[in-house]
Every structure is written in structure tokens, then in C-alpha cells.
């Protein structure tokens, strides 16, 4: 969908549908809506009176204009109470609107939602983001085309004579971010027989070449030379060879230390010898959602040309129960030199991240942030509406949580007290890779903390948020691309 702006009279603009915001509190006190009602000879007022139009958030009503306006339809989108409008609610409005447009078979539409009473001027970007993200679908493997007609164009209409340069800049930046989110969603949606470690490496090389990002891919031999046994041990059960992907975007000054982003890249997780149950195992193609988020974030940062230095590290491997697979009871010497007793081969994410976090130290980072679908315990504790965050630096965690509130990719902090470390002690190695049934999200993060050295570090557990089971206004069912917008917003905040 191409989203643009134009300074034109909405009452004279021909289109298949005109999107109009409708607040819940006294909707017809909005002069724009009142003007449209007048042109429709009181049709809206009548429906408000009968409570068929309420302005309830995300509720959509379609009215045919019957030639009274050049727009064939008025699509009224509920904004809720004007005092409760937030950026995320506006994204929801955009997502609800695009679903209604597609359902009505509209291909070309216009919008004045951003001009509704009580809506801030910059809302055009939030609404557009909801439209773009809500329009996503993954259907490349379907052999028969669907019946839904895509929305190809949406024009945001401003008052005639308005300087639209600022809005155009906002929409251009928004399009770059949404493209990166769609890229991440596509990666996570790919089946495990396609999205292998090599596939991730090839995708990284492709977009890096296009955007001028340095990309290095370490193969198994190089990983062995560097002692990355945390990653290599996990990969031993699969015929798919592991890869370690290094992305380097240098948009800041040479003396500015980089932010290192680390993404878990288990392209399929069977659990290994500690095999997962059959039910739901097909979803384990999403165990590389952290890697997808990091790749998408680096793509967006480069596309936006942010004046920051960012390193993306992606350890990529499959976790399968082959003849050479690592086993419970094995002891693995990680890249850091620390030894780990394997008590659960399904706790593989922390093993590959241990090497990546240690590798990150060579960049002398300003901060290290890892994203991972690390623990089912996080889904149990927090559900699917929020990701868990832990770290060793309160200011870093606070900035990430602020970015989460701004983007709707919210975070909830869990503690990392020393007592949790007792659970991870091993009788035969420096530590063990799983701590039993209690506090699983926290003990996993505590394990990771052992490999970050003195770096400022935060861990984001996206196990509950990487996949949407039912679908929400701007998050269709399936891969969410969570983390891309969060990381971009955080990085933008570091240069404000």
C-alpha cells in the first residue's frame, strides 16, 4: 500500500472510500464530522441517535454516500474517548480501518482521521503505521489467489494550502520502519525447511549489500576456531550447519561506541534429545524471532540513516535430536571459557546466546541488548500482551521500557537478584543450563548475565509476544515482528 499526503478539499476528492474519525464523546461536536453529516443530509446524526454509530474504539461503520460526495463511501472509525487517545490507539484505528477497507473491496481510499477533534497533528504517522502493519499477510505458499482485494493507495488529505512537508517526512520514515517489520514477520513466518541458518545468512547479506551495511558470516570452521562451543553444541544434531552473522552499521562518529543487538536464531527448535511434545511443535519455526527483530532493526536504522553505530549479532542454528546431538549430562566449554552442564537440551537458546554475548565484548559496546524467544515461562508469567525485560543497568531498562510504551511493544521488568543464581549452580561445571520449574524466565536471564562482562546489558524475552494467536487491529494472526519498532525507537532516543 502506498500512503501519501495531499492538500485537497475532502468534500471534493473522488475516491472509493473516505476514512473519518468518530470520537465516542459528543461525536457531532467535531466540525469536520458535522460537515460530512450535513452533506449526507443528517444520516450520521440519525445513526448516532439510534446508537448504530457510537465512536467506540475500533468500531467501524460504512455509509454509502449515494452521490452526495465524490467519495463513494464514508468509513467511520471509532476513536474512543478523545481524552484517552494514545499513539497505540491510533495505530489500532489504522489497523481496524484497513481491515474494513479490504472487506469492502476498496482499492483506493483517502483519510481525514488525523484531522478529527482531539487528535494530535503528528497522528498521521501513527495511523499510517496501523494501516501498514494491519495490512500484512503471509500467503506466498498458497497456490490459489485469495478473494480479498488489496488496498493499493491511501491519501491523507490536509486543508488546501497546507505545507505537507513534515507529514511527508513522517510517512517516509514510517514506511521504512514498516518495511523492516514486514521483513521480520516474513522471516518468522517461513517454514523451518526454508528458513535455515544459511537462509538467514543469505537474507542478511542481501539487504546489507542494498543498504551499505557491512555483513560478515562465520561458518562452522571459523566458529570452531573461535571456540563457539555454545552454538556448535546445539547445532550438532542437525544436518543444517550453523552460522554466526555479524552486521555493522556505522552511522555515528568513529569515536562513538556502538550499541550491540543480539538476536536468538534457532531456526527450528524440536527441543533436541529433551524432545518437545508434538502438540504445537510446528510453531517452533518462530524460535528465531529475536534474530528477525535484530535484522529488521538494523535494516530500519540503515534505511533511516540514523546517526548511530549499531552491531547486530545473530547466532543461527537448528536444535534437532540427531545422532550427534548434545545430550543431558554433557559439559560444554563456551567461548568465554566458562563450562556449562547440560541438564535440558531444550534450554538451547541461552547456549547460543552465551557465545554471542561474549563475542559482543570485542566491540567495546555502549550497551548490549538481546532479544530472544527464550522461555515458555515468560508466556505463563506475562501472557502475550507484554515482553519481559531484565538487565544489569536500571537506566538502560528504563529507556527500553519508555521505547516500549511509545511503540506499543511494552516491557515489564522482572528482578535479577543474586538468590536466583543459586538455582543455576552445578556440581560438576561452572553452571548448568536450566534451573528447574521455578522462575524460569529470571534464571534464564541470570544465566545470560554471566557472559556480558562489565557491559551495560538488557535481555528482552519475547516468547509470549513473537506470535499472535488470534489477531489484533494492527497485528494479524501469526508473526508479529515484535522488537523491530522497539529497538528503532530506543536507538532514536539515544541521539535525541
From Swiss-Prot:
Question: What cofactor requirement does the entry state?
Answer: Mn(2+)
Provide an example Pfam family for this protein: Peptidase_M17
Q: Please list the GO terms describing molecular function.
A: aminopeptidase activity; manganese ion binding; metalloaminopeptidase activity
Q: Which residues bind Mn(2+) 1?
A: 269, 346, 348
Localized where? Cytoplasm
- UniProt keyword Protease, yes or no: yes
The EC number(s) given in the record are: 3.4.11.1, 3.4.11.10
Does this entry carry the keyword Secreted?
A: no
Q: Which family does it belong to?
A: Belongs to the peptidase M17 family.
Q: Output this protein's name.
A: Probable cytosol aminopeptidase
Native organism is Geobacter sulfurreducens (strain ATCC 51573 / DSM 12127 / PCA)
Amino acid at each position: 500500500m502506498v500512503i501519501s499526503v495531499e492538500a485537497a478539499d475532502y468534500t471534493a476528492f473522488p475516491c472509493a472510500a473516505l476514512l473519518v474519525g468518530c470520537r465516542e464523546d459528543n461525536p457531532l461536536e467535531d466540525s469536520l464530522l458535522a460537515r460530512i453529516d450535513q452533506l449526507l443530509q443528517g444520516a450520521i446524526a440519525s445513526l448516532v441517535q439510534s446508537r448504530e454509530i457510537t465512536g467506540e474504539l475500533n468500531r467501524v461503520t460504512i455509509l454509502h454516500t449515494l452521490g452526495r460526495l465524490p467519495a463513494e463511501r464514508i468509513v467511520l472509525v471509532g476513536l474512543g474517548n478523545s481524552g484517552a487517545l494514545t499513539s497505540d490507539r491510533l495505530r489500532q484505528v489504522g489497523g481496524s480501518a484497513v481491515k474494513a477497507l479490504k472487506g469492502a473491496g476498496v482499492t483506493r481510499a483517502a483519510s481525514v482521521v488525523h484531522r478529527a477533534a482531539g487528535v494530535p497533528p503528528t497522528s498521521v504517522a501513527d495511523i499510517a503505521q496501523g494501516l501498514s502493519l494491519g495490512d500484512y499477510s503471509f500467503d506466498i505458499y498458497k497456490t490459489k489467489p485469495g478473494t480479498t482485494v488489496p488496498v493499493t493507495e491511501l491519501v491523507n488529505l490536509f486543508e488546501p494550502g497546507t505545507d505537507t512537508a513534515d507529514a511527508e517526512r513522517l510517512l517516509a520514515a514510517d514506511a521504512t520502519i514498516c518495511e523492516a517489520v514486514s521483513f521480520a514477520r516474513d522471516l518468522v513466518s517461513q517454514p523451518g525447511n526454508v528458513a535455515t541458518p544459511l537462509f538467514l545468512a543469505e537474507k542478511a547479506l542481501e539487504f546489507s549489500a542494498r543498504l551499505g551495511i557491512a555483513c560478515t558470516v562465520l561458518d562452522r570452521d571459523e566458529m570452531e576456531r573461535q571456540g563457539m562451543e555454545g552454538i556448535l553444541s546445539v547445532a550438532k544434531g542437525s544436518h543444517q550447519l550453523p552460522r554466526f552473522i555479524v552486521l555493522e552499521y556505522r552511522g555515528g562518529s568513529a569515536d562513538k561506541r556502538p550499541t550491540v543487538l543480539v538476536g536468538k536464531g534457532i531456526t527450528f527448535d524440536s527441543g533436541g534429545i529433551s524432545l518437545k511434545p508434538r502438540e504445537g511443535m510446528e510453531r517452533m519455526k518462530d524460535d528465531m524471532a529475536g534474530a528477525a527483530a535484530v535484522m529488521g532493526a538494523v535494516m530500519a536504522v540503515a534505511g533511516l540513516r540514523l546517526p548511530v553505530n549499531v552491531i547486530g549479532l545473530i547466532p543461527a542454528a537448528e536444535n534437532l535430536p540427531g545422532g550427534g546431538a548434545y545430550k543431558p549430562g554433557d559439559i560444554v566449554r563456551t567461548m568465554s571459557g566458562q563450562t556449562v552442564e547440560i541438564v535440558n537440551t531444550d534450554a538451547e537458546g541461552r547456549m547460543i546466546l552465551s557465545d554471542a554475548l561474549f563475542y559482543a565484548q570485542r566491540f567495546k559496546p555502549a550497551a548490549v541488548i538481546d532479544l530472544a524467544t527464550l522461555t515458555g515461562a515468560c508466556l505463563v508469567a506475562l501472557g502475550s500482551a507484554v515482553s519481559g525485560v531484565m538487565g544489569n543497568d536500571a537506566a538502560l531498562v528504563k529507556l527500553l521500557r519508555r521505547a516500549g510504551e511509545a511503540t506499543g511493544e511494552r516491557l515489564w521488568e522482572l528482578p535479577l537478584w543474586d538468590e536466583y543464581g543459586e538455582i543455576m549452580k552445578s556440581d560438576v561445571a561452572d553452571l548448568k543450563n536450566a534451573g528447574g520449574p521455578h522462575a524460569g524466565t529470571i534464571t534464564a536471564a541470570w544465566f545470560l548475565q554471566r557472559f556480558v562482562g562489565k557491559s551495560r546489558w538488557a535481555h528482552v524475552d519475547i516468547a509470549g509476544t513473537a506470535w499472535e494467536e488470534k489477531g489484533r487491529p494492527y497485528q494479524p494472526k501469526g508473526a508479529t515482528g515484535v522488537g523491530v519498532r522497539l529497538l528503532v525507537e530506543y536507538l532514536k532516543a539515544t541521539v535525541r
